[in-house]
């Protein structure tokens, strides 16, 4: 008999249990050029509906992104990224009970997303693009997921 360890990760009003079953993060990219969905959820209403669908299908976290990180993608301004993600997060925060993460490399975007109802920061640059995300995570007492990316979207395929 193999004993499995389980871990409980709690913050704010959320608790995730790791070790008993797979914890799925559903991803909704609110971009016109997403490599995973081809921009199908660029509309705020379609994006929120997709988030709800992912929760109904078993997602334990919903990740909302407003800037593509596909190879050779162009960066977007803070204002544009906020315009894309905040309305979706506001809608989902009222409709789902799972944590919502904001996929961003910018502290200004993360701040607005957290104020709108997100409760996790997911940074694909691992703080290389904006170390202020760590300070913001501490200020909001919220988890910070650090991802790995070689270079940036414009250069990661040639490094």
What are these regions (language model features)?
Residues 19-24, 59-60, 94-98, 118-119, ...:
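Short, well-ordered coil/turn segments that N-cap beta-strands
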Residues 1-29:
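N-terminal amphipathic alpha-helix/helix-capping segment at the start of soluble metabolic enzymes
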Residues 95-105, 119-129:
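Catalytic beta/alpha-barrel core
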Residues 74-102, 111, 138-149:
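Alpha-helix-loop-beta-strand connector modules within alpha/beta enzyme cores
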Residues 27-49, 74-75, 79, 99-101, ...:
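Active-site mouth loops of central-metabolism enzymes
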Residues 28, 54, 58, 103, ...:
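Conserved, mostly hydrophobic/aromatic
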Residues 32-34, 69-72, 116, 124-159:
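Conserved anion-binding
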Residues 34-36, 60-87:
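Glycine-rich, proline-tolerant flexible connector loops at the mouths of alpha/beta enzymes
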């Amino acid at each position: 008999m193999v004993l499995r360890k389980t871990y409980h990760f709690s913050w704010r009003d959320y608790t995730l249990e790791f070790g008993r079953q797979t914890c799925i993060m559903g991803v909704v990219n609110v971009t016109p050029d997403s490599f995973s969905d081809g921009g199908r959820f660029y509309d705020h209403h379609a994006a929120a509906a997709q988030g709800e669908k992912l929760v109904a299908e078993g997602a334990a976290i919903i990740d909302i992104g407003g800037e593509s990180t596909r190879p050779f993608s162009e960066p977007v301004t803070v204002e544009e990224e906020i315009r894309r993600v905040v309305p979706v997060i506001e809608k989902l925060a009222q409709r789902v009970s799972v944590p919502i993460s904001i996929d961003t490399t910018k502290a200004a975007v993360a701040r607005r997303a957290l104020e709108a109802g997100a409760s996790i920061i997911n940074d694909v640059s691992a703080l290389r693009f904006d170390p202020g995300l760590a300070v913001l995570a501490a200020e909001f007492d919220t988890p910070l997921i650090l991802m790995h990316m070689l270079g940036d979207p414009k250069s990661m395929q040639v490094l």
